[in-house]
Amino acid sequence: MRCFPVFIILLLLIASAPCFDARTKTDDDVPLSSLRDNLKRTIRTRLNIRECCEDGWCCTAAPLTGR
């Protein structure tokens, strides 16, 4: 009977412990916001390159014509 109160206290402590996700993260667990941010960054970069290459002065891929 001496162990019974200790057992009850331990059960209460275990039940009130903060829960956590026991699943380990894999490479496929990418937040959706991260994918959206990457897409926005890619589109913004491509648009900047396209605008820059029309002038031809700052794009390394476009040949410099007449300058």
UniProtKB/Swiss-Prot annotation:
Q: What is its main location?
A: secreted
Which GO cellular component terms are attached? extracellular region; host cell presynaptic membrane
List 6'-bromotryptophan occurrences by residue.
57
Removed propeptide positions:
20-50, 64-67
This chain is glycosylated at: 60
Q: Which InterPro entries match?
A: T-conotoxin
Q: Which cysteines form disulfides?
A: 52-58, 53-59
Q: Which residues carry this modification: 4-carboxyglutamate?
A: 51, 54
Tissue specificity of this protein: Expressed by the venom duct.
Q: What GO molecular function terms would the record report?
A: calcium channel regulator activity; toxin activity
Look up the signal peptide feature and give its range: 1-19
- Keyword terms of this UniProt record: Bromination, Calcium channel impairing toxin, Disulfide bond, Gamma-carboxyglutamic acid, Glycoprotein, Hydroxylation, Ion channel impairing toxin, Neurotoxin, Presynaptic neurotoxin, Secreted, Signal, Toxin
Return any one Pfam family short name: Chi-conotoxin
For this chain, the Swiss-Prot or TrEMBL PTM comment says:
O-glycan consists of the disaccharide Gal-GalNAc.
Q: Where in the cell is it found?
A: Secreted
4-hydroxyproline carried by residues: 63
Keyword Iron-sulfur annotated: no
Q: What does this protein do?
A: Epsilon-conotoxins act at presynaptic membranes, blocking the calcium channels or G protein-coupled receptors. Causes hyperactivity upon intracranial injection into mice. Causes dorsal fins drooping in fish.
Q: Which family does it belong to?
A: Belongs to the conotoxin T superfamily.
Q: What is known of its domains?
A: The cysteine framework is V (CC-CC).
Name the UniProt record assigns to this protein: Epsilon-conotoxin TxVA
Source organism of the structure: Conus textile
